[in-house]
Protein backbone atom coordinates (compact mmCIF):
# COMPACT_ATOMS: atom_id res chain seq x y z
CA UNK A 1 0.00 0.00 0.00
CA UNK A 2 1.30 3.44 -0.95
CA UNK A 3 -0.13 6.43 0.87
CA UNK A 4 -0.47 9.39 -1.49
CA UNK A 5 0.35 12.62 0.29
CA UNK A 6 -0.74 15.31 -2.19
CA UNK A 7 2.20 17.46 -3.22
CA UNK A 8 4.73 15.06 -1.71
CA UNK A 9 4.88 12.13 -4.09
CA UNK A 10 8.34 10.64 -4.58
CA UNK A 11 9.98 9.06 -7.61
CA UNK A 12 10.31 5.67 -5.85
CA UNK A 13 6.57 5.74 -5.13
CA UNK A 14 5.79 6.60 -8.73
CA UNK A 15 8.05 3.85 -10.06
CA UNK A 16 6.31 1.34 -7.80
CA UNK A 17 2.88 2.52 -8.94
CA UNK A 18 3.94 2.01 -12.56
CA UNK A 19 5.84 -1.25 -12.15
CA UNK A 20 4.14 -3.09 -9.28
CA UNK A 21 0.57 -4.02 -8.38
CA UNK A 22 0.54 -1.83 -5.29
CA UNK A 23 -2.67 -0.32 -3.98
CA UNK A 24 -3.02 3.30 -2.93
CA UNK A 25 -4.71 5.37 -0.25
CA UNK A 26 -5.12 9.11 0.17
CA UNK A 27 -3.33 10.60 3.15
CA UNK A 28 -6.05 11.53 5.68
CA UNK A 29 -4.06 14.69 6.41
CA UNK A 30 -5.28 16.00 3.03
CA UNK A 31 -8.99 15.64 3.80
CA UNK A 32 -9.47 19.02 5.47
CA UNK A 33 -7.97 20.92 2.54
CA UNK A 34 -10.07 18.93 0.05
CA UNK A 35 -13.25 19.66 2.01
CA UNK A 36 -12.45 23.38 2.29
CA UNK A 37 -11.94 23.62 -1.46
CA UNK A 38 -15.19 21.81 -2.21
CA UNK A 39 -17.13 24.02 0.20
CA UNK A 40 -15.63 27.16 -1.35
CA UNK A 41 -16.93 26.13 -4.78
CA UNK A 42 -20.36 25.27 -3.35
CA UNK A 43 -20.54 28.72 -1.75
CA UNK A 44 -19.57 30.46 -4.98
CA UNK A 45 -22.10 28.46 -6.99
CA UNK A 46 -24.85 29.28 -4.47
CA UNK A 47 -24.21 33.02 -4.82
CA UNK A 48 -24.70 32.83 -8.57
CA UNK A 49 -22.06 35.42 -9.41
CA UNK A 50 -20.15 34.53 -12.62
CA UNK A 51 -17.02 32.49 -11.92
CA UNK A 52 -15.16 30.76 -14.74
CA UNK A 53 -15.42 26.99 -14.70
CA UNK A 54 -18.10 27.01 -12.01
CA UNK A 55 -21.09 28.64 -13.69
CA UNK A 56 -19.77 29.63 -17.12
CA UNK A 57 -18.95 27.93 -20.38
CA UNK A 58 -15.42 26.91 -21.23
CA UNK A 59 -12.64 28.10 -23.50
CA UNK A 60 -14.04 30.48 -26.10
CA UNK A 61 -17.46 30.13 -24.42
CA UNK A 62 -16.19 31.43 -21.06
CA UNK A 63 -18.44 34.50 -21.19
CA UNK A 64 -21.61 32.39 -21.33
CA UNK A 65 -23.35 32.33 -17.93
CA UNK A 66 -24.93 29.01 -16.91
CA UNK A 67 -28.02 28.99 -14.63
CA UNK A 68 -27.67 27.23 -11.28
CA UNK A 69 -30.11 24.48 -12.21
CA UNK A 70 -27.92 23.48 -15.18
CA UNK A 71 -24.56 23.25 -13.40
CA UNK A 72 -24.64 19.46 -13.06
CA UNK A 73 -25.61 19.10 -16.72
CA UNK A 74 -22.78 21.48 -17.62
CA UNK A 75 -20.22 19.22 -15.94
CA UNK A 76 -21.63 16.05 -17.51
CA UNK A 77 -21.70 17.62 -20.96
CA UNK A 78 -18.13 18.82 -20.51
CA UNK A 79 -16.89 15.30 -19.80
CA UNK A 80 -18.82 13.66 -22.63
CA UNK A 81 -18.02 16.27 -25.28
CA UNK A 82 -14.32 16.19 -24.44
CA UNK A 83 -13.99 12.38 -24.56
CA UNK A 84 -12.76 12.40 -28.16
CA UNK A 85 -9.51 10.42 -27.97
CA UNK A 86 -8.37 8.09 -30.74
CA UNK A 87 -5.79 5.36 -31.12
CA UNK A 88 -4.69 2.43 -29.00
CA UNK A 89 -5.47 2.35 -25.27
CA UNK A 90 -2.86 3.79 -22.93
CA UNK A 91 -0.71 1.13 -21.32
CA UNK A 92 -1.71 -0.08 -17.87
CA UNK A 93 1.28 1.48 -16.05
CA UNK A 94 0.51 4.85 -17.64
CA UNK A 95 -3.14 4.79 -16.58
CA UNK A 96 -2.16 3.84 -13.03
CA UNK A 97 0.26 6.76 -12.92
CA UNK A 98 -2.31 9.11 -14.45
CA UNK A 99 -4.90 8.28 -11.79
CA UNK A 100 -2.40 8.65 -8.94
CA UNK A 101 -1.18 11.99 -10.29
CA UNK A 102 -4.73 13.28 -10.67
CA UNK A 103 -5.49 12.31 -7.08
CA UNK A 104 -2.40 14.15 -5.87
CA UNK A 105 -3.30 17.29 -7.79
CA UNK A 106 -6.92 17.29 -6.63
CA UNK A 107 -5.83 16.47 -3.09
CA UNK A 108 -4.02 19.76 -2.68
CA UNK A 109 -7.42 21.38 -2.08
CA UNK A 110 -7.34 24.03 -4.81
CA UNK A 111 -9.61 22.31 -7.33
CA UNK A 112 -12.90 22.37 -5.45
CA UNK A 113 -13.79 18.72 -5.83
CA UNK A 114 -15.62 16.59 -3.26
CA UNK A 115 -13.91 13.73 -1.51
CA UNK A 116 -16.53 11.27 -2.76
CA UNK A 117 -15.23 11.76 -6.31
CA UNK A 118 -11.66 11.15 -5.24
CA UNK A 119 -12.69 8.11 -3.20
CA UNK A 120 -14.25 6.67 -6.35
CA UNK A 121 -10.97 7.04 -8.25
CA UNK A 122 -9.13 5.28 -5.42
CA UNK A 123 -11.71 2.46 -5.41
CA UNK A 124 -11.37 1.94 -9.16
CA UNK A 125 -7.58 1.91 -8.91
CA UNK A 126 -7.51 -0.60 -6.07
CA UNK A 127 -10.05 -2.89 -7.75
CA UNK A 128 -7.82 -2.92 -10.85
CA UNK A 129 -10.60 -1.30 -12.86
CA UNK A 130 -8.71 1.05 -15.14
CA UNK A 131 -10.34 3.41 -17.63
CA UNK A 132 -9.72 2.71 -21.30
CA UNK A 133 -8.01 5.92 -22.40
CA UNK A 134 -7.07 6.37 -26.07
CA UNK A 135 -3.46 7.48 -26.31
CA UNK A 136 -3.95 10.21 -28.93
CA UNK A 137 -5.90 13.44 -28.80
CA UNK A 138 -4.11 15.88 -26.49
CA UNK A 139 -1.96 18.86 -27.43
CA UNK A 140 -0.82 19.43 -23.84
CA UNK A 141 -2.85 22.63 -23.21
CA UNK A 142 -5.47 23.33 -21.88
CA UNK A 143 -4.25 20.32 -20.02
CA UNK A 144 -4.74 16.79 -21.31
CA UNK A 145 -8.45 17.26 -21.84
CA UNK A 146 -9.38 14.28 -24.02
CA UNK A 147 -7.46 11.60 -22.09
CA UNK A 148 -8.72 12.87 -18.75
CA UNK A 149 -12.27 13.07 -20.11
CA UNK A 150 -12.14 9.34 -20.87
CA UNK A 151 -10.98 8.71 -17.30
CA UNK A 152 -13.78 10.91 -15.95
CA UNK A 153 -16.51 9.38 -18.11
CA UNK A 154 -16.00 6.08 -16.31
CA UNK A 155 -17.10 7.76 -13.06
CA UNK A 156 -20.39 8.50 -14.82
CA UNK A 157 -20.73 4.89 -15.95
CA UNK A 158 -19.92 5.76 -19.55
CA UNK A 159 -17.15 4.38 -21.75
CA UNK A 160 -14.98 1.32 -21.32
CA UNK A 161 -12.55 -0.03 -18.75
CA UNK A 162 -10.10 -2.86 -18.25
CA UNK A 163 -11.06 -5.09 -15.32
CA UNK A 164 -7.89 -6.94 -14.34
CA UNK A 165 -6.77 -6.59 -17.94
CA UNK A 166 -10.05 -7.62 -19.59
CA UNK A 167 -12.05 -5.04 -21.52
CA UNK A 168 -15.54 -4.30 -20.18
CA UNK A 169 -18.11 -1.52 -19.96
CA UNK A 170 -17.67 1.31 -17.49
CA UNK A 171 -20.95 0.29 -15.88
CA UNK A 172 -19.56 -3.18 -15.20
CA UNK A 173 -16.33 -1.65 -13.92
CA UNK A 174 -18.22 0.46 -11.40
CA UNK A 175 -20.12 -2.61 -10.24
CA UNK A 176 -16.89 -4.57 -9.69
CA UNK A 177 -15.43 -1.66 -7.73
CA UNK A 178 -18.57 -1.40 -5.59
CA UNK A 179 -19.55 2.00 -6.97
CA UNK A 180 -22.62 3.66 -8.47
CA UNK A 181 -22.39 6.25 -11.26
CA UNK A 182 -21.58 9.69 -9.89
CA UNK A 183 -23.29 13.00 -10.53
CA UNK A 184 -20.64 15.68 -10.83
CA UNK A 185 -21.32 18.99 -9.12
CA UNK A 186 -20.09 22.49 -9.92
CA UNK A 187 -16.56 22.59 -11.33
CA UNK A 188 -15.89 18.89 -10.69
CA UNK A 189 -15.86 17.87 -14.35
CA UNK A 190 -13.46 20.69 -15.18
CA UNK A 191 -11.24 19.81 -12.21
CA UNK A 192 -11.02 16.22 -13.44
CA UNK A 193 -10.31 17.18 -17.06
CA UNK A 194 -7.92 20.06 -16.61
CA UNK A 195 -4.34 19.10 -15.84
CA UNK A 196 -1.13 17.65 -17.22
CA UNK A 197 -1.53 14.19 -15.75
CA UNK A 198 -1.66 12.24 -19.05
CA UNK A 199 1.50 13.75 -20.49
CA UNK A 200 3.28 13.53 -17.13
CA UNK A 201 2.27 9.89 -16.66
CA UNK A 202 3.52 9.01 -20.14
CA UNK A 203 6.78 10.84 -19.51
CA UNK A 204 7.31 9.22 -16.11
CA UNK A 205 6.63 5.72 -17.39
CA UNK A 206 9.18 6.22 -20.15
CA UNK A 207 11.62 7.94 -17.80
CA UNK A 208 11.76 4.75 -15.74
CA UNK A 209 12.33 2.67 -18.88
CA UNK A 210 15.11 5.00 -20.04
CA UNK A 211 16.76 4.91 -16.62
CA UNK A 212 16.86 1.11 -16.90
CA UNK A 213 18.27 1.34 -20.43
CA UNK A 214 20.94 3.78 -19.28
CA UNK A 215 22.15 1.36 -16.62
CA UNK A 216 22.10 -1.47 -19.17
CA UNK A 217 24.12 0.62 -21.62
CA UNK A 218 26.83 1.11 -19.00
CA UNK A 219 27.13 -2.68 -18.78
CA UNK A 220 27.06 -3.27 -22.54
CA UNK A 221 29.50 -0.43 -23.13
CA UNK A 222 31.94 -1.77 -20.55
CA UNK A 223 31.65 -5.26 -22.04
CA UNK A 224 32.45 -3.80 -25.45
CA UNK A 225 35.60 -2.21 -24.02
CA UNK A 226 36.89 -5.65 -23.08
CA UNK A 227 35.64 -7.26 -26.30
CA UNK A 228 37.59 -4.67 -28.31
CA UNK A 229 40.61 -4.84 -26.00
CA UNK A 230 40.08 -1.20 -25.14
CA UNK A 231 41.94 0.79 -22.51
CA UNK A 232 40.60 1.71 -19.08
CA UNK A 233 42.86 4.76 -18.83
CA UNK A 234 40.22 7.11 -20.30
CA UNK A 235 38.07 6.33 -17.25
CA UNK A 236 40.69 7.63 -14.79
CA UNK A 237 38.92 9.81 -12.22
CA UNK A 238 41.45 12.61 -12.57
CA UNK A 239 40.43 13.27 -16.17
CA UNK A 240 36.78 13.72 -15.28
CA UNK A 241 37.31 15.74 -12.12
CA UNK A 242 39.12 18.32 -14.24
CA UNK A 243 36.03 18.85 -16.36
CA UNK A 244 33.61 18.87 -13.46
CA UNK A 245 30.33 17.60 -14.92
CA UNK A 246 28.61 15.43 -12.30
CA UNK A 247 27.18 12.99 -14.80
CA UNK A 248 30.52 12.47 -16.50
CA UNK A 249 32.25 11.89 -13.16
CA UNK A 250 29.60 9.36 -12.11
CA UNK A 251 29.61 7.55 -15.46
CA UNK A 252 33.40 7.19 -15.41
CA UNK A 253 33.23 5.75 -11.90
CA UNK A 254 30.67 3.19 -13.11
CA UNK A 255 32.94 2.09 -15.96
CA UNK A 256 35.89 1.76 -13.58
CA UNK A 257 33.82 -0.40 -11.26
CA UNK A 258 32.49 -2.61 -14.05
CA UNK A 259 35.94 -3.20 -15.59
CA UNK A 260 37.84 -3.64 -12.35
CA UNK A 261 39.74 -6.94 -12.28
CA UNK A 262 39.52 -7.66 -16.00
CA UNK A 263 42.18 -10.15 -17.10
CA UNK A 264 41.54 -9.10 -20.70
CA UNK A 265 42.61 -5.59 -19.83
CA UNK A 266 45.76 -6.79 -18.10
CA UNK A 267 46.65 -8.94 -21.12
CA UNK A 268 47.09 -5.95 -23.44
CA UNK A 269 48.17 -3.29 -20.97
CA UNK A 270 51.58 -2.90 -22.62
CA UNK A 271 50.40 -2.91 -26.25
CA UNK A 272 51.42 -0.14 -28.65
CA UNK A 273 47.88 1.17 -29.29
CA UNK A 274 47.78 4.82 -28.23
CA UNK A 275 44.08 5.74 -28.27
CA UNK A 276 40.76 3.96 -28.71
CA UNK A 277 37.98 5.22 -31.01
CA UNK A 278 35.60 7.72 -29.44
CA UNK A 279 32.76 5.22 -29.00
CA UNK A 280 34.93 3.47 -26.39
CA UNK A 281 37.12 6.27 -25.07
CA UNK A 282 34.49 9.01 -24.79
CA UNK A 283 31.80 6.95 -23.11
CA UNK A 284 31.97 8.94 -19.84
CA UNK A 285 31.62 12.21 -21.72
CA UNK A 286 28.65 11.11 -23.84
CA UNK A 287 26.94 8.94 -21.25
CA UNK A 288 27.65 11.54 -18.59
CA UNK A 289 25.84 14.19 -20.63
CA UNK A 290 22.94 11.76 -21.06
CA UNK A 291 22.93 11.10 -17.32
CA UNK A 292 22.72 14.81 -16.53
CA UNK A 293 19.75 15.17 -18.88
CA UNK A 294 17.95 12.15 -17.43
CA UNK A 295 18.42 13.42 -13.89
CA UNK A 296 17.23 16.90 -14.86
CA UNK A 297 14.14 15.51 -16.58
CA UNK A 298 13.37 13.37 -13.52
CA UNK A 299 13.48 16.48 -11.35
CA UNK A 300 11.15 18.41 -13.64
CA UNK A 301 8.70 15.53 -13.84
CA UNK A 302 8.70 15.07 -10.07
CA UNK A 303 7.77 18.74 -9.61
CA UNK A 304 4.98 18.34 -12.17
CA UNK A 305 3.78 15.13 -10.52
CA UNK A 306 3.18 17.13 -7.35
CA UNK A 307 1.76 20.21 -9.05
CA UNK A 308 -1.73 21.62 -9.11
CA UNK A 309 -2.31 22.01 -12.85
CA UNK A 310 -6.04 22.74 -12.77
CA UNK A 311 -7.69 25.97 -13.91
CA UNK A 312 -9.22 27.99 -12.42
CA UNK A 313 -7.71 27.54 -8.98
CA UNK A 314 -9.66 27.90 -5.76
CA UNK A 315 -8.17 29.67 -2.75
CA UNK A 316 -10.53 28.79 0.11
CA UNK A 317 -8.90 31.10 2.66
CA UNK A 318 -9.93 34.18 0.65
CA UNK A 319 -12.72 32.72 -1.46
CA UNK A 320 -10.91 33.78 -4.62
CA UNK A 321 -11.09 31.98 -7.95
CA UNK A 322 -8.01 32.71 -10.06
CA UNK A 323 -7.63 31.82 -13.71
CA UNK A 324 -4.09 31.03 -14.83
CA UNK A 325 -2.25 28.61 -17.05
CA UNK A 326 -0.83 25.81 -14.91
CA UNK A 327 -2.41 23.38 -17.38
CA UNK A 328 0.19 24.34 -20.01
CA UNK A 329 2.53 21.35 -20.14
CA UNK A 330 5.61 23.07 -21.56
CA UNK A 331 7.85 21.83 -18.70
CA UNK A 332 6.74 18.26 -19.40
CA UNK A 333 7.27 18.70 -23.14
CA UNK A 334 10.80 20.02 -22.64
CA UNK A 335 11.63 17.21 -20.19
CA UNK A 336 10.31 14.57 -22.60
CA UNK A 337 12.19 16.09 -25.54
CA UNK A 338 15.41 16.11 -23.51
CA UNK A 339 14.83 12.47 -22.59
CA UNK A 340 14.32 11.65 -26.26
CA UNK A 341 17.66 13.19 -27.19
CA UNK A 342 19.46 11.40 -24.36
CA UNK A 343 17.88 8.03 -25.14
CA UNK A 344 18.61 8.36 -28.84
CA UNK A 345 22.25 9.11 -28.04
CA UNK A 346 22.51 6.06 -25.80
CA UNK A 347 21.39 3.94 -28.74
CA UNK A 348 23.53 5.80 -31.27
CA UNK A 349 26.69 5.29 -29.22
CA UNK A 350 25.92 1.60 -28.76
CA UNK A 351 25.43 1.21 -32.52
CA UNK A 352 28.89 2.70 -33.10
CA UNK A 353 30.41 0.19 -30.70
CA UNK A 354 28.72 -2.68 -32.55
CA UNK A 355 30.20 -1.34 -35.80
CA UNK A 356 33.62 -1.22 -34.15
CA UNK A 357 33.40 -4.80 -32.88
CA UNK A 358 32.51 -6.32 -36.26
CA UNK A 359 35.30 -4.39 -38.02
CA UNK A 360 38.38 -6.62 -37.81
CA UNK A 361 40.70 -3.68 -38.49
CA UNK A 362 39.46 -1.79 -35.44
CA UNK A 363 38.70 -4.60 -33.00
CA UNK A 364 41.34 -7.19 -33.87
CA UNK A 365 38.57 -9.79 -33.81
CA UNK A 366 37.47 -12.04 -36.70
CA UNK A 367 35.41 -10.18 -39.32
CA UNK A 368 31.78 -9.93 -38.19
CA UNK A 369 32.72 -11.88 -35.05
CA UNK A 370 32.49 -15.31 -36.64
CA UNK A 371 34.96 -17.92 -37.82
CA UNK A 372 34.97 -19.04 -41.45
CA UNK A 373 33.83 -15.63 -42.67
CA UNK A 374 32.36 -15.83 -46.14
CA UNK A 375 30.51 -19.04 -45.54
CA UNK A 376 29.25 -17.41 -42.33
CA UNK A 377 28.06 -13.79 -42.20
CA UNK A 378 27.96 -13.59 -38.40
CA UNK A 379 26.88 -10.24 -36.98
CA UNK A 380 26.94 -8.41 -40.33
CA UNK A 381 23.20 -7.82 -40.64
CA UNK A 382 22.53 -7.67 -36.91
CA UNK A 383 24.55 -4.47 -37.08
CA UNK A 384 22.39 -3.27 -39.98
CA UNK A 385 19.34 -3.70 -37.76
CA UNK A 386 21.03 -1.66 -35.03
CA UNK A 387 21.86 1.04 -37.59
CA UNK A 388 18.25 1.12 -38.79
CA UNK A 389 16.96 1.54 -35.23
CA UNK A 390 19.52 4.21 -34.37
CA UNK A 391 18.61 6.15 -37.50
CA UNK A 392 14.89 5.89 -36.74
CA UNK A 393 15.54 7.29 -33.27
CA UNK A 394 17.24 10.34 -34.72
CA UNK A 395 13.97 11.26 -36.41
CA UNK A 396 11.89 10.40 -33.33
CA UNK A 397 14.16 12.59 -31.19
CA UNK A 398 13.13 15.73 -33.09
CA UNK A 399 11.57 17.97 -30.41
CA UNK A 400 7.78 17.92 -30.32
CA UNK A 401 7.70 21.06 -28.18
CA UNK A 402 8.88 23.31 -31.02
CA UNK A 403 5.52 22.74 -32.72
CA UNK A 404 2.25 24.43 -31.83
CA UNK A 405 -1.19 24.74 -33.41
CA UNK A 406 -3.88 27.10 -32.08
CA UNK A 407 -7.10 25.48 -30.86
CA UNK A 408 -10.47 26.45 -29.38
CA UNK A 409 -11.16 29.25 -31.88
CA UNK A 410 -7.72 30.73 -31.18
CA UNK A 411 -8.40 31.14 -27.45
CA UNK A 412 -5.80 28.46 -26.82
CA UNK A 413 -3.31 29.84 -29.31
CA UNK A 414 -0.09 28.21 -28.07
CA UNK A 415 0.16 24.60 -26.96
CA UNK A 416 2.98 22.34 -25.76
CA UNK A 417 2.51 19.05 -27.65
CA UNK A 418 3.73 17.42 -24.42
CA UNK A 419 1.64 14.29 -24.82
CA UNK A 420 3.22 13.44 -28.16
CA UNK A 421 6.68 14.35 -26.82
CA UNK A 422 6.15 11.87 -23.98
CA UNK A 423 4.37 9.22 -26.05
CA UNK A 424 7.10 8.82 -28.67
CA UNK A 425 9.62 8.08 -25.94
CA UNK A 426 8.20 4.55 -25.83
CA UNK A 427 9.21 3.94 -29.45
CA UNK A 428 12.68 5.34 -28.83
CA UNK A 429 13.11 3.19 -25.72
CA UNK A 430 12.01 0.04 -27.54
CA UNK A 431 14.54 0.72 -30.31
CA UNK A 432 17.30 1.30 -27.76
CA UNK A 433 16.44 -1.96 -25.97
CA UNK A 434 16.96 -3.86 -29.21
CA UNK A 435 20.19 -2.02 -30.04
CA UNK A 436 21.57 -2.84 -26.60
CA UNK A 437 20.53 -6.48 -27.01
CA UNK A 438 22.57 -6.65 -30.22
CA UNK A 439 25.52 -4.97 -28.54
CA UNK A 440 25.38 -7.36 -25.59
CA UNK A 441 25.44 -10.33 -27.97
CA UNK A 442 28.27 -8.86 -30.03
CA UNK A 443 30.32 -7.91 -26.98
CA UNK A 444 29.79 -11.33 -25.39
CA UNK A 445 30.98 -12.91 -28.64
CA UNK A 446 34.06 -10.71 -28.59
CA UNK A 447 34.82 -11.54 -24.97
CA UNK A 448 34.52 -15.26 -25.78
CA UNK A 449 37.05 -14.77 -28.56
CA UNK A 450 39.52 -13.21 -26.08
CA UNK A 451 39.82 -16.54 -24.22
CA UNK A 452 41.69 -17.69 -22.22
CA UNK A 453 41.66 -14.16 -20.80
CA UNK A 454 38.48 -13.40 -18.85
CA UNK A 455 36.52 -10.22 -18.39
CA UNK A 456 36.01 -8.62 -14.98
CA UNK A 457 34.07 -10.33 -12.18
CA UNK A 458 31.26 -7.79 -12.54
CA UNK A 459 30.96 -8.35 -16.28
CA UNK A 460 31.15 -12.12 -15.91
CA UNK A 461 27.66 -11.85 -14.39
CA UNK A 462 26.50 -10.20 -17.61
CA UNK A 463 28.16 -12.96 -19.63
CA UNK A 464 26.37 -15.62 -17.60
CA UNK A 465 23.04 -13.87 -18.09
CA UNK A 466 23.56 -13.78 -21.86
CA UNK A 467 24.86 -17.32 -22.16
CA UNK A 468 21.99 -18.67 -20.07
CA UNK A 469 19.75 -17.84 -23.02
CA UNK A 470 22.01 -17.68 -26.08
CA UNK A 471 25.01 -19.87 -26.91
CA UNK A 472 28.25 -18.65 -28.48
CA UNK A 473 27.77 -17.90 -32.18
CA UNK A 474 29.76 -20.67 -33.93
CA UNK A 475 27.89 -20.95 -37.23
CA UNK A 476 25.19 -18.96 -38.98
CA UNK A 477 21.72 -19.77 -37.72
CA UNK A 478 18.29 -18.17 -37.38
CA UNK A 479 19.45 -15.07 -35.49
CA UNK A 480 16.26 -13.12 -34.67
CA UNK A 481 15.25 -15.22 -31.63
CA UNK A 482 18.66 -14.56 -30.02
CA UNK A 483 18.10 -10.81 -30.25
CA UNK A 484 14.51 -11.13 -29.04
CA UNK A 485 15.38 -13.11 -25.91
CA UNK A 486 18.20 -10.77 -24.89
CA UNK A 487 16.01 -7.72 -25.58
CA UNK A 488 13.41 -9.26 -23.27
CA UNK A 489 16.06 -9.65 -20.58
CA UNK A 490 17.02 -6.00 -21.12
CA UNK A 491 13.41 -4.95 -20.51
CA UNK A 492 13.29 -7.15 -17.41
CA UNK A 493 16.27 -5.21 -15.98
CA UNK A 494 18.50 -8.29 -15.90
CA UNK A 495 21.48 -6.18 -16.97
CA UNK A 496 20.45 -2.86 -15.42
CA UNK A 497 20.74 -4.36 -11.95
CA UNK A 498 24.39 -5.22 -12.65
CA UNK A 499 25.26 -1.53 -12.98
CA UNK A 500 26.82 0.14 -9.93
CA UNK A 501 24.98 3.37 -10.76
CA UNK A 502 21.34 3.77 -9.79
CA UNK A 503 18.69 6.48 -9.97
CA UNK A 504 16.61 8.26 -7.35
CA UNK A 505 13.48 6.39 -8.47
CA UNK A 506 15.11 3.09 -7.47
CA UNK A 507 15.98 4.07 -3.91
From Swiss-Prot:
Domain of life: Bacteria
Catalytic reaction(s) noted: L-histidine = trans-urocanate + NH4(+)
Gene Ontology molecular function terms on file: histidine ammonia-lyase activity
In-chain residues carrying the UniProt-annotated modification 2,3-didehydroalanine (Ser): 142
Pfam families in alphabetical order: Lyase_aromatic
Enzyme Commission code(s) on record: 4.3.1.3
Enzyme class at the top of the EC tree: lyase
Keywords: Cytoplasm, Histidine metabolism, Lyase
Record's keyword annotation contains Cytoplasm: yes
Post-translational modification (record): Contains an active site 4-methylidene-imidazol-5-one (MIO), which is formed autocatalytically by cyclization and dehydration of residues Ala-Ser-Gly.
Crosslinked positions (5-imidazolinone (Ala-Gly)): 141-143
Record-linked Gene3D superfamilies: Fumarase/aspartase (Central domain), Fumarase/aspartase (N-terminal domain)
Protein's GO biological process: L-histidine catabolic process to glutamate and formamide; L-histidine catabolic process to glutamate and formate
Localization annotation: Cytoplasm
NCBIfam families: hutH (TIGR01225), PRK09367.1 (NF006871)
Recorded family membership: Belongs to the PAL/histidase family.
Matching PANTHER family: HISTIDINE AMMONIA-LYASE
The protein's name: Histidine ammonia-lyase
Source organism: Burkholderia pseudomallei (strain 668)
Amino acid sequence: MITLTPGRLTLPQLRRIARENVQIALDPASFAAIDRGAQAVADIAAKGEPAYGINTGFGRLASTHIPHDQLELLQKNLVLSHAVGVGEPMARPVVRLLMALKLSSLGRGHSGIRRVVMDALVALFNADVLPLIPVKGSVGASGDLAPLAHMSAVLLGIGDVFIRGERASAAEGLRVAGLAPLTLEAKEGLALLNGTQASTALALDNLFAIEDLYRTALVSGALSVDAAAGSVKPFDARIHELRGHRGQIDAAAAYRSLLDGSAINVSHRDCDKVQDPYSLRCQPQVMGACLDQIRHAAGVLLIEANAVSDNPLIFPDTGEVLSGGNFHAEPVAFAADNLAIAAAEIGALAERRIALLIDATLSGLPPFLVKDGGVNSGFMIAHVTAAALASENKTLAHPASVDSLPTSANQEDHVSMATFAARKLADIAENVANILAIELLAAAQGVDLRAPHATSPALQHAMKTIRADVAHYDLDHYFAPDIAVVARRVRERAFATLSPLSFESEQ
